[in-house]
Amino acid sequence: MSSRVLTPDVVGIDALVHDHQTVLAKAEGGVVAVFANNAPAFYAVTPARLAELLALEEKLARPGSDVALDDQLYQEPQAAPVAVPMGKFAMYPDWQPDADFIRLAALWGVALREPVTTEELASFIAYWQAEGKVFHHVQWQQKLARSLQIGRASNGGLPKRDVNTVSEPDSQIPPGFRG
């Protein structure tokens, strides 16, 4: 069994029992590692060094700043479970993927960087409502994941351009052309 000794001073348990005051007085840093049967058993610490360690622990336990963050920042509300229809069902307007949809999509081999936008979900629901097909909830989520993968990759991963924006002329001259 390997172990790490955290002090250069090592003494056998018999020597410590025989004259503990002298052993601790000679210890560098007020700490000595005590061995029994050629293995570290415990550390012996002087009262002064113990007081230093306790003061250091108390100092580290106090916050380094007087700014306190509100606890509600750390407490995320539990998502209320959504009633998912059992078995196969046709797409309906209020359908939502599970809260851990991005994780599930990754398990299905679809890496999504961002969550589903409301526009993407609305488009998906509208398309499949018109189709009238029935699938299980997990199958709908898989279809949504594939739809997002294809839709987002169609433009090289870039967001779609707004067709209403007016383009601005480029005044740079490409290399190799005279201006």
From Swiss-Prot:
Question: Which residues are ssDNA-binding?
Answer: 124, 127-128, 133, 143, 146
Q: Which UniProt keywords apply?
A: DNA replication, DNA-binding, Primosome
Pfam families documented for this protein: DnaT
**Result of mutating residue 136 to A?**
Decreased ssDNA binding
One GO cellular component term, please give it: primosome complex
A single Gene Ontology MF term assigned here is: identical protein binding
The ranges of region (Disordered) come to 156-179
Does the UniProt entry include the keyword Plastid?
no
Role this protein plays: Involved in the restart of stalled replication forks, which reloads the DnaB replicative helicase on sites other than the origin of replication. Functions in the PriA-PriB and PriA-PriC restart pathways, but probably not in the PriC-Rep pathway. Displaces ssDNA from a PriB-ssDNA complex. Also involved in inducing stable DNA replication during SOS response. It forms, in concert with DnaC protein and other prepriming proteins DnaB, PriA, PriB and PriC a prepriming protein complex on the specific site of the template DNA recognized by PriA.
Question: What is the name of this protein?
Answer: Replication restart protein DnaT
Q: Which organism is it from?
A: Escherichia coli (strain K12)
